[in-house]
A protein has these predicted regions:
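Anion-binding alpha/beta catalytic cores of soluble intermediary-metabolism enzymes, centered on
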Residues: 1-144, 148-222
Length: 222
């Protein structure tokens, strides 16, 4: 087709549109998974959270892909990604289940790029409270840094976090979900999306399409 971007989801199920999108346009080379993220604009700054829509129970490899995709997407919005892999556990305090998978994902990502500003696993308050984090865990490579990117351990926690923030903090501007990782700019809305939400996602999709046409390989949403 001739379209440069596609917005879907208002009158269809997420699961159906996600499956079709993946089958039609495929996943970006170098990745096995795609994801979505939300942008939160607040008085405390701009934050990026994911994966808020796609991967229900991500394993270590999926979390690695999500983190790498979010890292590139955050740069598109002219922010330097300082990333925390979220969990109920802190830096190996629980060694089984989800925390162990998150911990292993952090190890892989740090070995892959020693300059990458990412650490975890850690609880949300540890991630966002720089002074507390530096005092309790002085060994972290995020020492002295303000975290702006949160990779959640599963879809339930990320989705609930974004919904809770929208409900409890109406002054926070929430943008998303923004698809990251497919070969084309396909973005998803739902029946709860307002006109403003749809317009915002459409604007992001337009930027996404422009970046795609410039054949961006790293710092792009798709």
């Amino acid at each position: 087709g001739e379209a440069d971007a596609f917005i879907t989801g208002v009158y269809t199920k997420y699961s159906n549109t996600i499956k079709v999108a993946k089958e039609v346009v495929g996943i970006k080379p170098g990745y096995e998974h795609f994801a979505t993220m939300h942008i939160l604009n607040s008085k405390k700054g701009t934050f990026f959270i994911g994966d808020t829509l796609i991967n229900r129970h991500p394993d270590t490899d999926t979390l690695v892909d999500v983190a790498r995709l979010m890292e590139g997407a955050v740069r598109v919005f002219n922010h330097e990604p300082v990333m925390a892999m979220a969990s109920y556990s802190n830096f190996g305090s629980d060694t089984v289940g989800s925390p162990a998978e998150v911990h292993e994902a952090v190890r892989i990502l740090q070995e892959e790029d020693p300059s990458r500003l990412i650490d975890g696993e850690m609880q949300i308050n540890i991630a966002l409270d720089k002074e507390l984090r530096d005092r309790k865990y002085p060994f972290t490579r995020l020492r002295g840094k303000d975290v702006n990117t949160l990779v959640f351990p599963n879809l339930s926690s990320a989705n609930m976090a974004s919904k809770l923030i929208q409900y409890m903090s109406p002054d926070v501007e929430v943008i998303g979900p923004l698809q990251i990782g497919l070969n084309k700019p396909i973005h998803f809305t739902d029946f709860e999306s307002s006109v403003r939400d749809i317009l915002t996602i459409t604007a992001v999709a337009a930027i996404d399409a422009i970046v795609s046409k410039c054949k961006c390989t790293e710092n792009c949403l798709i």
